[in-house]
Amino acid sequence: MNYLIKPIIFLFVFNVASAQYAVSNYSKAFQDSSRLNREILTEIYYPVPLQNEDISALDGPFPIILFGHGFLINWDTYQNLWDEFVPQGYIMVFPRTESGLNTDHQQFGWDLQFLVTKIQEEGDSNTSPIYNLVHNNTALMGHSMGGGASFLAADSLCVNNNNQLKTIIGLAVAESSSNGVSSITSALNVTIPALIISGSQDGVTPPDVHQLPIYNNLSSNYKTIISILGGGHCYFGNPNFFCDLGESASSNGISISRVEQQQVTFDFLNSW
């Protein structure tokens, strides 16, 4: 397994307990009153005690990872991510909006932005499964289209001095340029620590067209871009028909397996 790093900078944003947890999940439809009560169906994966352990074994509250899915890629394609991070003591949140052909990247970015504060409210509600389990620290993460939308969300959050958002992580980030917006332009306003990981053989979102311009525009004092040698676009998640079809038509020279690419990715994400 090979990888290139530019530059080598690691930032430990969250202090998560080493205890291992089981994973539970619930779905909830949130409504954004500022956008005509737009409904944002959301999947929430959170730590619960292992079998035979008492609820007191939960060492919360737990930081949030808010994840944006790729174009035509269902949220459950990323089970590899919640299986990796939730047992370590993170809550992962997946909006299911903008999953069809006619996607609006700006709306998806606004969905992610909205959920940053909405999940905090969810943690304050005594009827919520994650009551008293939500830490203020939040990371935005996304793959492909969702990565680009994450930078659109971070733009506004950074400009407005949001105090929850602590880092942003992009996996094979796609430039989101629908409706006059641009993830590359939005990166100029992103001041939080940022990590971008790409596959060197990604022909869907070629790094020199998508990830590198975003990285170069970042105003973050701490930023890292990693290119996984021989890696592809779709290997950050589990198999998905539409993603894999697009990859087969556009990418050449992928020389590592999906498992290998995910292991390299986890090595760096866990350090970050």
Model-predicted segments: where are they?
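Short conserved active-site loop signatures built around small residues
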Residues: Q20-L66, I91
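Sec-dependent signal peptide recognition
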Residues: N2-F10
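The conserved beta1-alpha1 loop
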Residues: P63-G70, R96, A172, S198-G199
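C-terminal catalytic-base region of ester-bond hydrolases, centering on the histidine
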Residues: Y215-W272
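Gly/Ser-rich "nucleophile elbow"/oxyanion-hole loop immediately N-terminal to the catalytic nucleophile
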Residues: I55-P61, Q106-G148, S156-N160
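N-terminal signal peptide c-region/cleavage motif recognized by signal peptidases
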Residues: V13-A17
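Short amphipathic alpha-helix adjacent to the substrate-entry channel of hydrolases
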Residues: I73-S99
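The feature captures the conserved acid-bearing segment of alpha/beta-hydrolase catalytic domains
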Residues: N162-H233
